[in-house]
Amino acid sequence: MLRAAAAAAAVFPSRFAAAPAVAAVEEVRSPLLRVLGALRGGRVSTLGRRARFCSNSAGSDSEAAAAEAKAEDAVAAEGEADGKASSAIVPTVLRPEDCLSVIALPLPHRPLFPGFYMPIYVKDQKLLQALVENRKRSIPYAGAFLVKDEEGTDPNIVTSSDSDKSIDDLKGKELLQRLNEVGTLAQITSIQGDQVVLLGHRRLKITEMVQEDPLTVKVDHLKEKPYDKDDDVIKATSFEVISTLREVLKASSLWKDHVQTYTQHMGDFNYPRLADFGAAISGANKFLCQEVLEELDVYKRLKLTLELVKKEMEISKLQQSIAKAIEEKISGDQRRYLLNEQLKAIKKELGLETDDKTALSAKFRERIEAKKEKCPAHVLQVIEEELTKLQLLEASSSEFNVTRNYLDWLTVLPWGNYSDENFDVHHAQQILDEDHYGLSDVKERILEFIAVGKLRGTSQGKIICLSGPPGVGKTSIGRSIARALNRKFYRFSVGGLADVAEIKGHRRTYVGAMPGKMVQCLKSVGTANPLVLIDEIDKLGRGHSGDPASALLELLDPEQNVNFLDHYLDVPIDLSKVLFVCTANVIEMIPNPLLDRMEIIAIAGYITDEKMHIARDYLEKNTREACGIKPEQAEVTDAALLALIESYCREAGVRNLQKQIEKIYRKIALQLVRQGVSNEPTQEAAIVTASEEPNGGDSANKLKDETMEDPATENAAMTNADTASKEASELDLLNRTVDHDVHPAETPKEAVLTDSALSTDKLCTPEGNKDMEGAKEESADKAVEKVVIDSSNLGDYVGKPVFQAERIYEQTPVGVVMGLAWTAMGGSTLYIETTKVEEGDGKGALVMTGQLGDVMKESAQIAHTVGRAILLDKEPENLFFANSKVHLHVPAGSTPKDGPSAGCTMITSMLSLAMGKPVKKDLAMTGEVTLTGRILPIGGVKEKTIAARRSAVKTIVFPAANKRDFDELAPNVKEGLEVHFVDTYNEIFDIAFQSETQTETS
C-alpha cells in the first residue's frame, strides 16, 4: 500500500504535497498526521484517487485526467494485491457527477472548498453509521454545508440562549434551515472512530429534502459561468492574487511549500481553482469564505479572493513587525547588558569603581560608624554578621536583596539618639494654652510629667489615654504636647487594625516583609524618644492574623518595652523613652489588660462658655481669614454664636460648630462677590476652609500665633488666675438658654442683611443678576454694606434649628419629673412620666414604654417597689399602688435608653402621681436606687450639670458619693445652682415635695 501511495505521489507530486495544508486551514493547521494516518489505515485506493488539488501538473485537462486514471488504476491494483485492504476496495465507485441526493453534513467552522481535505467529528451515531453503510455500497460521497447563524444574531458573538441549540441536536427541517444552500460535494476518504475525513470535489446547491434523519437532500451540481481564459482583467487579477500570495510567503513561512507549488506551476492551474486556493488558505471569516464558495462568476470570485489574501498579507506584515520589534528589543537588552558588564570589568581592573556589594557594605558601615558609641553591642554584632553574609551572596540572588533591606533598616534606626527635651513648665503652659482652650485636666497632667522630668534630669516614657467624644481635641492636643516637650511627633491610627504584623512586623522569610509601625516610626522621626499618638485605640479589630490588642500589651508596658522585639528586625529595641498618647471615644471598648497599662484622662467636652470662647477667638477668626473676608465686611455676633451652639451644635466637641461657622462665611463670601467685592490677596496662600487644614476637626480650636489679634497674648502665658477671671467675665452667657429671648448687642448702622437680600433664589435669577450688575456700576465707589449675622437671621444661613428646647414644662405637672442623662453628645435632660391606667382592688401593676433597656426596666421595677414602701410610710392610708395600674413612659420613644441612674427619678414620678402633688419647680435629679432606698453614685456629673444649666434648672439632686466629682468642676459651671447630695431616698422626698427638712447644699 505504501508503494501504491508512492506511485500516486510520483504522478501527482503537487497534489499530494499541497493537500495536507488545505486541511490544516480548517483545524489547527497541522493535518499531515491525519493524512498519513489515513494512508496507513487501509484507505489507499480512495485516498490515492482523490488526494489531489484541482489543477493538474500536466499540460491540459485531458492529459491530467488520463494521468489521474493511470494513478487510480495503479493504486487499485496495489490495493487488490494487499490482503488487509481488499475489503475497502470497491471495483466500481459512483462517479461524483452521478450524485443527485446526498447526506447533508453540517460544517460549523469553515466551508469546504473543492480539492481540499477537511476532518470533521460526527457525534450522531446514526449519521455516522449511514456514512459507513454508503461507503460499503460504493457511495463514498456526502454534501458538506456551512452552518449559518440564526437571524438577528451577531455572527461574532457566541450566545447561550435556549434557541441556540447544538448543531448536533438539530434534525430534519430545523437542521436544513440552519444550513447554507450552497455547499461542496465531499468524498469520504476515511472514517476512524467519530472522525470523518472529507475531500471536496465540486459545488452543490440544495433543492429539497429527501429524508429527515439522517438529513438527506437533493442537490444540483453548480458549474462556473463561462469565461474567457485570455481575458486580460482575469489574468491581471489572478497574477495579483499570485503576487499577493508570494508576499504572504515572504512575511510568513506557514504556507511556504503550498504557495511555492502554485506559483511555480501557475500556467497549469485554472483560474477558479486559484481563487478557491487563496480563500481556503486564508484565515478569513467563515462567512467571507462562504461568499467565495457561492460565487460562480470567475472574475468576481478572484476579486473576493484577492481581498481576503490582501488582508492576510497585512496581518502577516503586522505579525512580522511585532516579531521584529521584540527581537530588536531583546537583542538590544542583551547588547546593553554585555556592554555594562564589560564596562564594570574594565573599571574594576583600573580601580575606578568597586562592585555593588562593596559599595553597599561601605555605605552601611559609614552609617553605623556615626552611631557606634551609642549603638548596643548586640546590634553591632548582628550588623557585622549580616555584612559578612552580604559579601558571600550573589547580587542576583533573592537572599541578597533580603539581606540588603535588613541591613538598611538596622543601620538607619536612631540607636541611642535622643532629642533634647524642654522641661520649662512655663513654656509648656504657654504652648498648651495657645493651642487649646480648656482641657485643664490634660494640661495639668502634662505639666506634672514635665515637672518630674525636671527634678530627675531625665524623663521616662509614659502611656496616657485621652478618652472623650469626637471633636474635643484629643488628636490635636497630642501634637501640642510634643511641641511643648520639644519631642518629635508621630501618629498612626489602629482603628480597624486586624493584623498583628502591622505592630510587630513580618518575619523576614516572607516576600515583601516589612517592620512594624514602631520601627517605621523610629526611622521616620530619627530619634529614640518621640511622642507617639496611637489614635482610635478603642476600635482595634481582630482577625485570623491574631489579636492586635494583645500585641500592644508588650508595646505599652513600661516594664517590657525596654526590650521590644520586632519580628522583622529580630533584635531588641529600647522604647522606654517613648511617650505614648492614646485616644479613644469609649474606654469600655478597650480590653481590660490593655486598659490597665494606661493612665486614663477623661475629656468630658466643652461647656457653653468654652465653646463661645473657642468660636469667637479661634474658629470665627480663622474661618473668616480662610474665606478672604475682612473684619469690616462681615461680623457674626455673640448672640448668633450662642444660638448656634445651643440650637445647632450641642455635641461635646466643636467640630460641628466649626462646620456651621464655615457654612455661614461661605454664604457671606458668595453674597459679597455678587455685590462686586474683590479683595486683594494679602498673602500668597490658597483660600481654603478651616476643615481642610491638615489636622482636621480636632485642630479647629487651635489658636495660631499669626491669627491672634491681641499682641499681648503672643508673648505671655495665660495663668490659672487669668483663665479664671476670663471665665468669670463670660458667666452671663451661661445664664442665657434657648428658651429665653436672646437680644443681640446693638448693631452698627451699616445695615443688617435681611432675609430678602439673602434669598439665593432671587440672586440666581437673570433679573437678579442684572439688578446686581446695574447696582455695581452705579455704586462702584461706594463702600459695601457690612454683613451682620445675629440670632434673628441666623436661620437664613444654617437652616432651621436642629435641637429644640429640652425643657417641656415650666412647672412639671403631677406624675412628671425631670431627670438627667448622659449621651455620646454630652449631657441631656430626660423626663419620666407616669399616669394611672386602671383602678380597682388588687389591680396594682406597672407598664413601661419608651424603648427601655433591660437595666432601665429593672430600675423601674425597683422604683415601683421602693415607692410603695415609702408611700406606706408617709401616707399609710393611701392604697394607690395596691389598687392602681401605673403606666411609666420615657419620652423620645425612638431613642434607645438604658442605665440605672434614673431610679430616683422614677420613684419621685410615681410618688407624685400617688399623692397628687407636683414636684418642686426647676428641679432635676439623678441617682441609682436600691431596694432599701439607698442612692448609689452615677457617672457623667459634668455633662449632666451642663445639661441642667442649659435647661434653666435651679436645683439638682446628686448622690452623696458624687460630691467629690462635683467639687472638681470649674466654678463657672457650678455657680448659680442649688445642689443637694443625698444618701437615701427619704432626703430626695423632702426636697422634691418641699419638706422643711434640709440637706447639705453646695
From Swiss-Prot:
Binding positions for ATP per the UniProt entry: G468, P469, P470, G471, V472, G473, K474, T475
An example Gene Ontology CC term for this record: mitochondrial matrix
Active site: S901, K944
SMART domains: AAA (SM00382), LON (SM00464)
InterPro entries in the cross-refs: AAA+_ATPase, ATPase_AAA_core, Lon_bac/euk-typ, Lon_lid, Lon_proteolytic, Lon_Prtase, Lon_prtase_N, Lon_prtase_N_sf
EC number in record: 3.4.21.53
Pfam family name, one: Lon_C
Coiled-coil parts of chain: none
Residue span(s) of domain Lon N-terminal: 102-313
Molecular function terms, GO-annotated: ATP binding; ATP hydrolysis activity; ATP-dependent peptidase activity; sequence-specific DNA binding; serine-type endopeptidase activity; single-stranded DNA binding
Enzyme class: hydrolase
Subcellular location: Mitochondrion matrix
Domain of life: Eukaryota
Family recorded in the similarity comment: Belongs to the peptidase S16 family.
Miscellaneous notes: This protein may be expected to contain an N-terminal transit peptide but none has been predicted.
UniProt xrefs under NCBIfam families: lon
Listed name of the protein: Lon protease homolog, mitochondrial
Organism of derivation: Oryza sativa subsp. japonica (Rice)
